[in-house]
């Protein structure tokens, strides 16, 4: 009989769970009980609630994300990069009876200190779905990952997503703005500025000045700022992209479209994989191996 197992993406603010029989998803559930929102409950109690009537005898549970961080259930030690893809699923941390956490990855060099949790599971899936030498994983903190067919060799992090949120919501740039609207032209204009002048710090106040002076519609500041930051990010990582024969984007639909536009402007072809699809493929491969 094909093995039954539970796969969980447990982040800071949300928890998503899937019940599988082999490669077939039998059920899925979602909770707002991220590791920073447990409301006094233990992680074990939350897991028991979410997986009620799912676990039969010793059904394996494999978890990824911030659940393995120092604010989660238990620290799942980072694996140092370079790291073989196969080693990720071989060094799981146990927190209970057949309940396991996938390790994160880290880099610690004189010129590069970085960590990731959750993205390593997406990488395992993306490697199967769209093999590449460079994986770009947009989000709050965009990961740029160099890899070959066997191992992850290096990665960097660019905080464009968080910077956009902070500037728009907690700085003078976004103060007093009306509700923002989608505006492809404003995004494209910001993208061009960022690609052509990636030293973005001197340009940030100009975003405010532009809407104060009326040259940028106040409802389109978010779109222009998004383009500016993504353009600057992609341009500043130009050396990381150089000589890469294949680039895979791993993200949701909206961010994929924005980064595709940036790469196309640089003359780079990319393949896109949905972030959720990559994550589920990655965690299934690990959980399936554990269950069998």
Language-model features: locations:
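Short glycine-aspartate micro-motif
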Residues: 5-9, 60-62, 133-137, 248
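Short glycine-rich, Thr/Ser-proximal phosphate-binding strand/loop in the N-terminal lobe
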Residues: 5-42, 273
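Glycine-rich phosphate-binding loops at beta-strand->alpha-helix junctions
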Residues: 14, 244-262
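N-terminal phosphate-binding loop and adjacent alpha-helix
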Residues: 24-60, 68-75, 175-176
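Glycine-rich phosphate-binding loop plus the immediately following alpha-helix
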Residues: 38, 106-193, 197
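Short beta-strand-loop/turn "lid" adjacent to the catalytic site in phosphate-handling enzymes
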Residues: 54-113, 149
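Adenine-nucleotide phosphate-binding core of ATP-dependent small-molecule kinases
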Residues: 193-234
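Glycine-rich phosphate-binding/hydrolytic loop that grips phosphoryl groups
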Residues: 235, 268-292
């Amino acid at each position: 009989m094909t093995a039954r197992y539970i796969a969980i993406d447990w982040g800071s603010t949300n928890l998503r769970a899937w019940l599988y029989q082999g490669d077939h998803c039998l059920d899925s559930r979602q909770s707002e009980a991220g590791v920073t929102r447990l409301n006094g409950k233990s992680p074990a109690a939350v897991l028991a609630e979410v997986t009620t009537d799912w676990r039969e005898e010793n059904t394996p549970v494999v978890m990824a994300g911030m659940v393995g961080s120092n604010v989660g259930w238990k620290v799942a030690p980072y694996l140092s990069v370079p790291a073989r893809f196969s080693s990720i699923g071989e060094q799981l941390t146990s927190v209970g009876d057949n309940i396991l956490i996938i390790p994160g990855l880290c880099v610690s060099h004189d010129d590069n200190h970085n960590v990731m949790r959750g993205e390593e599971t997406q990488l395992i899936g993306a490697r199967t779905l769209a093999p590449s030498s460079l994986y770009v994983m947009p989000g709050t903190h965009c990961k740029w990952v160099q890899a070959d067919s066997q191992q992850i060799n290096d990665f960097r992090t660019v905080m464009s997503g968080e910077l956009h949120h902070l500037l728009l919501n907690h700085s003078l740039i976004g103060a007093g703005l009306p509700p923002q609207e989608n505006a492809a032209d404003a995004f494209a204009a910001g993208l061009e500025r960022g690609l052509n002048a990636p030293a973005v710090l001197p340009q940030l106040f100009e975003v405010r000045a532009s809407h104060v002076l009326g040259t940028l519609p106040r409802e389109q500041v978010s779109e222009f700022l998004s383009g500016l930051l993504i353009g600057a990010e992609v341009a500043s990582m130009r050396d990381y992209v150089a000589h890469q024969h294949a680039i895979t984007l791993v993200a949701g639909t909206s961010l994929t479209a924005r980064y595709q536009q940036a790469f196309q402007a640089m003359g780079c072809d990319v393949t896109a994989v949905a972030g959720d699809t990559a994550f589920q493929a990655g965690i299934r491969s690990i959980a399936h191996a554990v269950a069998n």
